[in-house]
Amino acid sequence: MRIGIVSDLYIDKLGSPPLPTEMPDVMVLAGNIGCGTKGVEWAARTYTCPVIYVLGNYSYRNHDLAGFDEELRATAWGSNLHLLQNETIFIRGMRFIGATLWTDFALFGDAVSGMVAAENLCEDYKYIRNSEGKPVTPADTMALHRQSVDYLWRTATDPYDDGHTVIVTHHAPSSRSIPAGYQDDRAAACFASNLDELVIEADAMLWVHAGVYGPVDYMLGNTRVVANPRGVPVGKGLRGVENFRADYTLEMHGNPREGTGWWSST
């Protein structure tokens, strides 16, 4: 199976990226494709293959955090796009598990100070609304983080003997995903959590995430962790990621029933 991987496209600000010359078997869009319904609408009309779609924080801007998922499901209805929010889908024997995975703000050890920093540093807490129309708080997104972590522990650690598992989250599951130069940045607690134990215990073949300041590719236990972001917020603007690859694809080899499997990059 060939899996295309991109994230943080910000199509409403940066325009549509170049498309792969050859459509993969599955396309993984790991969040922040566009604000509101723009990302889902674009993806549904752009890709002819099945699309795994996870929401990033940017998609919720100027929308209701609690109800927006269902609005997007209605938008995607009847298309080849699969919106995963603490959900699992099977495609050609591959198990895909997806969630936004908001952070716990404890990347630097103290969640309380991380939440205070988030309110000051992250514009999500100005522009994303709750059901009462008021700005959401770090406590609101931390509650969603706990729901996702609980789902991932229950689901991803349940062995899947008929194929391999791919986990897709928007926010990063490990501090190892933070690029050099940003590892002391207090804002990093808004896009990554220390979930190394979960990654190792889930033992997925691949964990795709987004929301960081550059490409990611490393092993954590038996799991390959990758990210391929196109753009990153800078102040109130955006800048492009120098090493973004619009055609980034991983191909799965091996037979999971025989306990074999590896990825090659194209």
Residue positions per predicted region:
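N-terminal active-site segment of His-dependent metallophosphoesterases
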Residues: 1-53, 59-68, 138
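A basic- and aromatic-enriched beta-loop-alpha substructure that forms the phosphate/nucleotide-
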Residues: 52-59, 64-125
